[in-house]
From Swiss-Prot:
Cofactor detail note: Binds 1 zinc ion per subunit.
HAMAP family (UniProt xref): Thr_tRNA_synth
Transmembrane region(s): none
Protein name: Threonine--tRNA ligase
InterPro entries in UniProt: aa-tRNA-synt_IIb, aa-tRNA-synth_II, aa-tRNA-synth_II/BPL/LPL, Anticodon-bd, Anticodon-bd_dom_sf, Beta-grasp_dom_sf, TGS, TGS-like
UniProt record similarity statement: Belongs to the class-II aminoacyl-tRNA synthetase family.
UniProt organism field: Azoarcus sp. (strain BH72)
């Protein structure tokens, strides 16, 4: 009979098969009450799961992220149950857990309204009060297909029909509502008391624009009311900081229907872009990278050799010319190998660091596009390092140090790191994987960095490190990547002459620090709420005259500051100075400079810092000294 090992190392022995719920009860009444699900030998299961042999067990409660995910998954089913009670003709499709919440897609004859959302949430609360048991049932696949067809749930029947015929499927029943799901779920709807439906959207069935547009309902669920309130407050702040809204308000960029997923950068937005790109360009140049430029449109044959045509052709923009098929490049790596292959390379030439701010195009589904965060045309701070196996650790360590410096300069110091190791299906010898994984781990440890290990999550062609930064709202953005590649140099014939005079394939390190510049600038806009530090600000200051008599002096000030290298504008309109100050405050400029008769006579300016701080009168020399200090330290008012 089963001996059950708990996370603290203790073992509980039973003389009969036992459920997860019974094990929890044997430990204590408090745990029995708090238990939501379990994890048996690494597999998440319901409390009703019966353990028949020796196993390792962890009881999941709402104190763990995994337990909260069970709550969210169950709340998605609660949402579907409520929709079916209120709108019986609606068909259910899928309802996964996502970061901080969940969604469920429905097929219905009309779009849901905000009033519908309120009614659905109210019905969900009623279902919670009923404390309906949530029970798992296992059916033969064909029986499940027939059942869902019989009740008019054709999408669900289609999903189940794609499962092999000899497999059983698990269903969950709560009251009259039955849904397909692997589970696990909470034992009763009464455990789902803290939730909120947040928004409505459209989504194509299976993400294909040729299919029906479904109604997507988003929601969030938490263990405690305080957690929900904190999250909703964060959403309010995020709404205020929405880069799309600030992009219009600050005259940075726009996107229009004639070019979906492609950005029209306005003068101020392009100035911001240039500050980011020029900083990155200067930084990588100082660290030994050679910047290159490769074609936008490349013959299909290269993409077939690289393997991208088979994997990415649906996401490629293609064209034809003179009976040849071409693709607008979705990434730079195959083209960089073409440069590497020009001329014989020796081990003495390695490591070779090749960078490109390459413009890439990917035909992302229209429903996934989001401002400048998710686009079809983007530029990456892309680079590839060609090196020997022995050089991997040193190159990885240098890149990690560089990445930390860049993130810190942009104001991000909280970085999360994940190391993904070999998957079951892979290329390359185990010895090469052993060395590569050890090199990446050693590079991280050399920097004193903690990381999360993700066994089996690496690409088939090499292990990788992912770097995510946390913004001022504690949102996590995955930006940086260091991906080892044992495959592409072999496929595209990249070779070098080794020290023993034999030809070998280099290891290729794909690396990016900020990733898509468009997305990173969107992150910056939201992180700073549009109030950029001086070094990034599109306009450093505006000079405003109090009356017409100071117009010439205001112009002199603008010219002097521009000659000193600053981005300064003049506002010489015949408007009251307080009106000008209020208007430019909306534009979030770091500084406002006011000149009246006193300032003109003394050859100074009255300086107001963003946020309203009054620095009084400063000479232009003092102001330039202050600004140069802020630029050098990449600081300034935020």
């Amino acid at each position: 009979m089963p001996n059950i090992k708990l996370p603290d190392g203790s073992v509980r022995s039973f003389d009969h098969p036992v459920t997860v719920a019974e094990v929890a009860a044997s430990i204590g009444s408090g745990l029995a009450k708090a238990a939501l699900a379990g994890r048996v030998d690494g597999k998440a299961v319901d409390l009703s799961y019966c353990i028949e042999r020796d196993s390792e067990l962890a009881i999941l409660t709402d104190k763990s992220a995994e337990g909260v995910d069970v709550i969210r998954h169950s709340t998605a089913h609660l949402l579907a149950h409520a929709v079916k009670e209120l709108f019986p003709e609606a068909q259910v499709t899928i309802g996964p857990v996502i970061e901080n919440g969940f969604y469920y897609d429905f097929s219905y004859k009309r779009p849901f309204t905000p009033e519908d959302l309120e009614a659905i949430e109210k019905r969900m609360a009623e279902l919670v009060k009923r404390e309906l048991p949530v029970e798992r049932e296992v059916w033969p696949r064909d029986k499940a297909v027939a059942f869902f067809k019989s009740i008019g749930e054709h999408y669900k029947a289609e999903i189940i029909a794609s499962i092999p015929a000899n497999e059983d499927v698990s269903l969950y029943r709560q009251g009259e509502f039955v849904d397909l799901c692997r589970g696990p779920h909470v034992p009763s709807t009464g455990r789902l008391k803290v939730f909120k439906l947040t928004k409505l959207a459209g989504a194509y069935w299976r993400g294909d624009a040729k299919n029906e547009m479904l109604q997507r309902v988003y929601g969030t669920a938490w263990a405690k009311k305080e957690d929900l309130e904190s999250y909703l407050h964060m959403l309010e702040e995020a709404e205020k900081r929405d880069h799309r809204k600030l992009g219009r308000q600050l005259d940075l960029f726009h996107i229009q229907e004639e070019a979906p997923g492609m950005v029209f950068w306005h003068a101020k937005g392009w100035t911001l872009w240039q500050q980011v790109e020029q900083y990155l360009r200067g930084t990588i140049s100082r660290h030994g990278y050679q910047e290159v430029r490769t074609p936008q449109i490349v013959d299909r044959s290269l993409w077939e050799k690289s393997g991208h045509w088979g994997m990415y052709s649906d996401l490629m923009f293609t064209t034809q010319s003179e009976k040849h098929d071409y693709a607008v490049k979705p990434m730079n790596c195959p083209c960089h190998i073409q440069i590497f292959n020009q001329g014989l390379k020796s081990y003495r030439d390695l490591p070779l660091r090749m960078a490109e701010f390459g413009s890439c195009h990917r035909n992302e589904p229209s429903g996934s596009l989001h401002g400048i965060m998710r686009v079809r045309n983007f530029v990456q701070d892309d680079a590839h390092i060609f090196c020997t196996d022995e050089q991997v650790q040193e190159e990885a360590a240098a890149f990690i140090a560089l990445l930390q410096k860049v993130y810190a300069d942009f104001g991000f110091r909280d970085i999360q790191i994940k190391l993904s190791t070999r998957p079951e299906k892979r290329v390359g010898a185990d010895e090469q994987w052993d060395a590569a994984e050890a090199a990446l781990a050693a590079a991280l440890k050399a920097q004193g960095l903690e990381y999360e290990l993700q066994p089996g999550e690496g690409a088939f062609y090499g292990p990788k490190i992912e770097f995510s930064l946390k913004d001022c709202l504690n949102r996590v953005w995955q930006c940086g990547t260091l991906q080892l590649d044992f495959n592409l140099p072999v496929r595209l014939g990249a070779e070098y002459v080794a020290e023993d005079n034999t030809k070998k394939f280099p290891v290729m390190l794909h690396r990016a620090i900020v990733g898509s510049l468009e997305r990173f600038i969107g992150i910056l806009i939201e992180h700073y709420a549009g109030a950029m530090p001086l070094w990034l600000a599109p306009v450093h200051a505006v000079v405003m005259n109090i009356s017409e008599g100071q117009a010439d002096y205001a112009t002199e000030v603008v010219n002097r500051l521009r000659e000193a290298g600053f981005r300064v504008e003049a506002d010489l309109r015949n408007e009251k100075i307080n009106y000008k100050i209020r208007e430019h405050s909306v534009h979030k400029l770091p500084y406002q400079l006011v000149v009246g008769e006193k300032e003109k006579a003394a050859g100074v300016v009255a300086v107001r810092v963003r946020g309203g701080q009054d620095l009084g009168q400063l000479s232009l020399d003092k102001l330039i000294e202050r600004w140069n200090g802020e630029l050098a330290s990449r600081s300034g008012p935020v």
